[in-house]
Amino acid sequence: MSAGGASVPPPPNPAVSFPVPRVTLPAGPDILRTYSGAFVCLEILFGGLVWILVASSNVPLPLLQGWVMFVSVTAFFFSLLFLGLFLSGMVTQIDANWNFLDFAYHFTVFVFYFGAFLLEAAATSLHDLHYNITMTGQPLLNDNQYNINVAASIFAFMTTACYGCSLGLALRRWRP
């Protein structure tokens, strides 16, 4: 008790004073019924295919395709994490501006994947170049590697397009 007989009010409980998370996408399985959820699923599918195809070509040009592998593997796992946070409903428990985080994530990955797509297409275009081993010209990419890299380039483009669509949807949610 204080000097005047009045009691001091208890300090506010910090758990009660947290603001509500800002997210306009639904949490739980309902995320899969939205365009954004469908695009994230396509990003995971196509990104996984890029990863598998580049790895199966034995990475004949590591300087170019190393970045493609890094981007595809990293984006694959972060997209899985992103989808997992929404499917589990954790986005409603974590105080963050999820609309901005969605935009920032998709912008970053779109820029990186666009660069990866260009590098993969550049690696594929080197099919007709030859290098000299003991006076015999050997192609940089054999026909099997070329075919795999063509498929990887196509899926890298499709993945980039999916990230671009997700970026557009995220921008609409973030900037009403």
Swiss-Prot record:
Keywords: Cell membrane, Glycoprotein, Membrane, Transmembrane, Transmembrane helix. The keyword Protease does not apply. InterPro entries: MAL, Marvel, MARVEL-CKLF_proteins. Residues 1-34, 88-102, 171-176 are cytoplasmic. GO terms for cellular component: apical plasma membrane. Residues 31-175 form the MARVEL domain. GO terms for molecular function: structural constituent of myelin sheath. The chain crosses the membrane at residues 35-55, 67-87, 103-123, 150-170. Residues 56-66, 124-149 are lumenal. It is found in: Cell membrane; Apical cell membrane. Glycans are attached at residue 132. It is a multi-pass membrane protein. It comes from the Eukaryota. Member of the machinery of polarized transport. Required for the indirect transcytotic route at the step of the egress of the transcytosing cargo from perinuclear endosomes in order for it to travel to the apical surface via a raft-dependent pathway. Belongs to the MAL family. Interacts with TPD52L2. This is Protein MAL2. The gene is MAL2.
